[in-house]
Amino acid sequence: MVAGRAVLVSKYLSVARKTSRLRRFRHELTLVEQGVSRIAGVDEAGRGPLAGPVFAAAVIFPVEWILGGFPKSLREVNDSKQLTPETREVLFNELVSRPEVCYAITEVDCQMIDQINILRASHRAMNLALAQLRPAPEHVIVDGLRVKSMQFPQTPIVAGDAASFSIGAASILAKVSRDRLMVQLDQTYPGYGFAQHKGYGTPEHLAAIKALGACPIHRQSFSPFLPTQPQLFAESA
């Protein structure tokens, strides 16, 4: 790393401890200080629903943004679950319209989820997204726990979608993409209310399953009638 950039990074690392906006780039800044410039944030959406695919997205911001030039129009980027649907849509459109942002969005369908389980399917979606990034990342910051199958150096961050702009952006791209698909699938499979609950195990969705039975996009390995799986009924991912 050139001396000038090293001084600049050290300055921003110091400021980041006091400034909430820069604090959400502290993980990226630490890597930049180590000479890493292509840092991908990766996250998934749709781990908990009873229906539909799981999505993942990966995002690389230009290092200049990390070093203090982050656009004002993107400063609301956060954990997608903490944002309104309207705000997510605005930020999604802003992210994908920026030529400086390198991103990829992928999905793994419910049949594969049933074959390999939701954790492996989520990791597969993440790895597929990372593999599509051009240029490839030098380091990945991951929401949650370490992904054993990942081929890149990685830093897992608990609640990373709220702690990192890069992961937060990935969470928005993944969630909006999945939500849009579930709205479309509501037309293909009417009666289940996919446009409203996006496949999560709401009382309305469970009642529809009881009345209509499962449809082709339901995850057969997720039983909505097993009380031992309460985590499936909350929008936790």
Language-model features, listed with the residues they occupy:
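RNase H-like, Mg2+-dependent phosphodiesterase core
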Residues: 1-237
